[in-house]
Regions:
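Acidic-aromatic substrate-binding/catalytic surfaces of carbohydrate-active enzymes
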Residues: 35, 572-647
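Extended, loop-rich substrate-binding clefts of extracytoplasmic carbohydrate-active enzymes
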Residues: 231, 296, 574-578, 621-673, ...
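Beta-strand-rich recognition/accessory modules
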Residues: 567-580, 587-589, 597-608, 647-655, ...
Length: 801
């Protein structure tokens, strides 16, 4: 984007009617990137005008008319300017990429576009002029620019579109890239648990009364941990001399340290987990600056560290990457109440550092192929970041080996233009891309783009990065008509092939809708399981024909093939009286899938959707066995044990030899559930029993949790609060426990869970306004060393109002 203007006036005619008197001189001692700049200028001018300007390699300036590429020490690494020097055109820039970007920006000015790796637009011109009525010093809006889609990694595409990210295949010939080492989530690369934990558990998180490394973090107030982290970063600097930024960042889960020192620092920093983290990162950065003042230390403001600390400030050599992982992606952040909490954090971080980076999210990570209408948000929020002083953007999209994320090429190109110039007209850029790539089919494809975004503009149409959105009941038929029109308008097989690829998201959405499970009589399954499998195989063949290897983060197509093959229709066992109907699917983890309140005519359990990971084995009410409060549940194989009028018994064989039992019955207006964990083995096993349900909160914006604590304190508050994330969780124990009854009220629906205090050690509440609204209540037994023949028990009672 332009930075500085000084008046000049010159019109240089480089080519007229296919002829030119100009040659290109890359300078006396050009860098590899400046040699590439000369070659790219020569190639593209020839393609536009049929005039081939000679590239002259010379130690001193040749005679005659020249396009001179000049390295200027006084210009920044990516800054450049164009100017006239007599009859010469001078493209001057800093190193390593200034001159190269000066050439690409000039070609862009002449109408050259590099839309995708395969599609370039080169205008045909009989005359090529440069009108220099002013000298313009130019450079990018952000120092770090990375659209993180597989399609954006290509070296030529990335260089020509002036991005410089870590994952892009840029090398010395393109002026390199902004390289991290490692990229993120580096705590266990700094101090590998397999190396240190056995001898030094004090290096790792203190959680629930003991040191842990599984799904934990580092003890950030331990001075030896700081010393070892400094040594490791110095080793990285030696091993990766091309890297500029070194990541000292939390693991990708919770598990922060709860030791007295770390908690004391949290309290000093306003109760924020970011306090111990930033003090630790600053301590590492201070030592690194002494030996390597040109290197930067990076960390995250992410998840539990997203809120800024009260006192500590990032050092000048520290980059904070703020991650808006919980926001709505369909609306501009400044206009959406679901994103207000992030804007509060962004403003706060931007007040305490001028080195702020953003880790933005641009896809549905659970479903790379799902339509993801976020262009309104992008158009507003990339300029918004710039206004708030952000200096770098990582825009995380779909990144599997074979690419293929929804609108990946369009999104990458538009974002690259915004990252260079925040004043880019996104709407015009979308139209230009569609016309450039799809030609005569652009009009119906633009109509599809508008159809998709019209629904997203409605105030209640929130878009999240893991959930299945509501596209509206008529979206699929309208979309199919527009794609049919696009195919009819296409003039060649190559265009039709591109359109077919762009239609994959609509086909995938249809597949997910066909996967939806419902109760039909005494069965729980999709409407047509055989047809669903056939439809999946058809889509799978198309995906593979396009080289697409994955449609979910972390899972390949082989996983999906096994997943669809394993789908089944399940028997349903029901309990019913005048007040309630309870539907249970024993083979789905012994799960109660529906608790129907006949008076309210509502399911007291939350709705599930076919886009959820693990579907249909999700949601409902069930029981689990764990090693402790932090461990994941052990797998269990559930079966129906007994069903008779008014009572059902289920049994679950736990993978470690323990046994779960669930006894369900109706008593008036209550569902009574007794969950039992038994040890039939000959050895003691440390374990905890958990039981609970995913409840329907009604209107999530009105939903409240209400209970009286064991110490007598009354708790009654909304789940969704202004300037707070639209999701959350809380845990109570001791005198903070509910006194045997707690309730979720949500406008037209109310559900209570009753329990015995003598059986419960902890109670947990979690909630979300993302996707299918949910409020989950969980009860935990004490962690107990279960001897042979011993058991744990949790009894619950559920009722509506």
């Amino acid at each position: 984007m332009p930075w500085l203007l000084s008046l000049l006036l010159a019109v240089l005619e480089l080519v007229n009617d296919g002829r030119s008197g100009y040659r290109i001189w890359p300078g006396a001692a050009p860098s590899p990137a400046e040699r590439r700049a000369a070659a790219e200028l020569q190639t593209h001018i020839a393609a536009m005008t049929w005039a081939r300007l000679e590239v002259v390699e010379a130690a001193s300036q040749p005679a005659g008319k020249l396009v001179r590429l000049e390295w200027r020490r006084d210009l920044g690494a990516e800054q450049f300017l164009w100017r006239a020097d007599g009859t010469d055109l001078v493209i001057a820039g800093g190193r390593p990429r200034g001159v190269l970007y000066g050439v690409y920006t000039l070609l862009d000015h002449w109408g050259v576009r590099w839309y995708t790796r395969e599609v370039t637009r080169i205008p045909q011109l009989s005359r090529l002029q440069v009108k220099l009525d002013r000298e313009v010093l130019q450079g990018p809006a952000f120092e770090y620019r990375e659209p993180f889609f597989t399609e954006a990694w290509d070296k030529d595409w990335a260089a020509r579109n002036r991005t410089n990210g870590h994952f892009q295949e840029l090398d010395e010939s393109t002026g390199g890239r902004l390289r991290y080492q490692p990229f993120v989530h580096s705590f266990y690369e700094l101090l590998p648990p397999e190396k240190y934990f056995a001898a030094h558990p004090e290096f790792y998180s203190w959680i629930d009364g003991k040191r842990r490394w599984e799904r934990a973090q580092l003890c950030l107030t331990n001075p030896v941990v700081i010393q070892l982290a400094v040594e490791k970063v110095r080793q990285w600097i030696a091993d990766y001399p091309e890297a500029r930024i070194f990541s000292v960042s939390q693991n990708d889960w919770e598990g922060w340290c709860e030791c007295d020192r770390c908690r004391r620092v949290e309290q000093e920093e306003g109760g924020e987990h970011s306090g111990p983290l930033l003090r630790f990162v600053n301590a590492v950065a201070e030592e690194i600056e002494k030996t390597h003042p040109d290197r930067l230390i990076d960390t995250l403001a992410y998840w539990y560290t997203e809120n800024p600390p009260l006192k500590v400030r990032p050092r000048p050599n520290v980059r904070i990457r703020l991650c808006p992982i919980g926001v709505c992606q369909s609306h501009p952040y400044e206009k959406c109440p679901r994103s207000a909490y992030f804007m509060k954090n962004l403003r706060a971080w931007s007040r305490i550092t001028n080195q702020l980076y953003i880790w933005h999210y641009n896809t549905n990570f659970a479903h790379y192929l799902l339509p993801f209408p976020d262009f309104d948000e992008l158009a507003a929020d990339i300029p918004m970041y710039h206004r708030h002083g952000v200096v770098g953007l990582f825009l995380e999209g779909a990144y599997p080996k074979g690419g293929g994320g929804e609108m990946a090429e369009l999104r990458s190109w538009v974002m690259a233009r915004q990252l260079w110039d925040v004043n880019t007209n996104v709407d015009a850029a979308v139209t230009e891309f569609l016309e450039g790539v799809y030609g005569s089919a652009a009009k119906p494809l633009r109509a599809y783009f508008d159809l998709l975004h019209r629904r997203a503009r409605q105030p209640d149409a929130h878009l999240w990065i893991f959930n299945l959105p509501d596209y509206g009941h008529d979206f699929i038929p309208q979309a199919e008509k527009l794609f049919a029109a696009a195919m009819a308008a296409a003039k060649d097989g190559e265009s039709r092939r591109r359109i077919e690829k762009q239609q994959l998201p609509v086909e995938y959405l249809k597949l997910l809708e066909a996967r939806r499970y419902e109760i039909r009589g005494d069965k729980y399954g999709p409407a047509d399981l055989a047809g669903l499998r056939d439809r999946f195989q058809t889509l799978l063949a198309k995906l593979r024909s396009f080289g697409i290897t994955s449609i979910h983060e972390g899972r390949d197509l082989d996983f999906d093939e096994k997943d669809y093959a394993a789908l089944d229709v399940y028997p349903v066992i029901s309990l019913e009286n005048e007040a309630l109907r309870v539907d249970i699917v024993p083979r789905l983890s012994g799960r109660v899938i529906r608790l129907w309140d006949k008076r309210a005519r509502r399911n007291l359990l939350r709705d599930t959707d076919p886009g959820e990971r693990g579907y249909p084995d999700v949601g409902g009410a069930m029981a689990w066995a764990h090693a402790d409060y932090q461990a994941r549940a052990w797998p269990a194989d559930w079966q129906l044990e007994m069903a008779e009028p008014g009572r059902v018994s289920l049994t679950g064989a736990v993978s470690n030899g323990l046994r779960l039992r669930r006894l369900l019955r109706l008593e008036g207006e209550e569902l009574v559930v007794d969950s039992i964990l038994e040890n039939p083995t000959g050895q003691p096993v440390e374990a905890a029993l958990r039981a609970g349900a995913d409840l329907n909160p009604g209107d999530i914006d009105r939903a409240r949790v209400a209970f009286r604590r064991r110490d007598g304190t009354l708790i009654a508050r909304r789940l969704i609060e202004p300037e707070k994330p639209p999701t959350g969780n809380e845990v109570w124990s001791g005198d903070g426990l509910p006194d045997g009854l707690w309730r979720i009220d949500g406008g037209g629906i109310s559900t209570a869970q009753r329990f015995s205090l003598s059986e419960v050690e902890r109670a947990a509440l979690s909630w979300t306004a993302k996707g299918a609204w949910r409020a989950s209540l969980s009860l935990w037994s004490q962690v107990t060393r279960l001897g042979p023949g011993e058991r744990l028990r949790l009894s619950e009672r559920y009722h509506g109002r």
